[in-house]
Amino acid sequence: MISRQSRVCSDAPSGGSEPSAGIGAVPETCTVLPTTTARENPATGSNGECPEIKRRSISGLVSRPVDALRQIDDWDVPFAVAGVSRPEGTVATRGDTQSAVRLASVSKPVTALAVLIAAEEGVLDLDEPAGPPGSTVRHLLAHASGLPFDGTVPIGQPGRRRIYSNEGFAILGQHLALRAEMPFDEYVRAAVCEPLALALDPAGHPGAGMHACLDDLLVLGRELLEPTLIAAETLAEMTAVQFPGLDGVLPDFGRFTPLDWGLGVELKSGKSPHWSGSRTSPQTFGHFGGSGTFLWVDPVARIACAALTTREFGEWAKTAWPRLSDAVLAEASRG
């Protein structure tokens, strides 16, 4: 059984920021910002001004995608922050990198990483039963369990269709807690947050309720480029197509044949249009969230890019995110 002990949970203050309904309190080092549906303030920084781009001098980088990040100044959102990282560290950021927002579905890769750590530790097996009859942990991670977006009554047979399911990740969280014999959020803190020194708060829905700041996501992106918490072979399995050939609907983007998915991460493969833009490689993986968040990792370009906003995903993001992503890669490729 897992030998890690959660220090984050025991050290958490009893007061501090008030949590959103159903969501645990966020560490005092983070300022939690609400998600909105429209522009409330032209600022992209929490102080009402646009923080300057922060550069990190990293040996060996041929180019730093700095100018590309200025695009977020033109986004019609109350708050925006974006950044780029490589395995060596963070390349550049623009905006307030320490204010936390709800990640929405960007929570799913965090949960997936915790589940994969548990699998390596022998806490659970990816192919053990979990969820509806015939489903396994692997099915739940890959949205192939037959469960609907919400609700516990299956609408398909496991392994037959790619049905995007928040409920599947709720069940994953329960299953991990049962097998680890500790609360889900405590396991994530001990297995993921503490080793990576993240302020990320894993309380709430395992597939939609976590809070984090940009600094956290950029560290997570580096971890998914060069893992330290899981073996390289496990990362390869995470980013390989699970149950190949399944058709499905990518939320807000439509039907794809096939709709490739890994273990808790969406795989770009041949999808077009795609929220990560046209310059990212087919090997790119990651997730976007309905609260206006995204993280993609391109193992070919060796770059991770993330953005957090407080405006719900919509048509604005379908244009803004690919444009930003393409500019980041274009600038990074220039020697």
Label each region the model flagged.
Residues S3-S10, S14-S20, P27-C30, T35-P42, ...:
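Low-acidity, Ser/Thr- and Arg-rich intrinsically disordered low-complexity segments
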Residues G60-L103, A114, A142, E266, ...:
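A short, well-structured edge-of-sheet supersecondary motif
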Residues A68-L69, A82, E88, R102-D127, ...:
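Active-site SXXK
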Residues G95-Q98, I155-P158, F169-A170, P202-P206:
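Flexible glycine/proline-enriched surface loops and loop-helix/loop-strand junctions
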Residues R102-V106, A118-P154, I163-Y164, L178-G207, ...:
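Active-site helix/loop module of the DD-peptidase/beta-lactamase fold
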Residues P109-L113, H143, G168-H175, A208-I230, ...:
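Active-site-proximal alpha-helical segments within enzyme catalytic domains
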Residues H205-A208, A212-L214, A240-V300:
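Active-site Gly/Thr loop motif
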Residues L246-L250, G314-G335:
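Short, gly/Ser/Thr-rich active-site loops of penicillin-recognizing serine hydrolases
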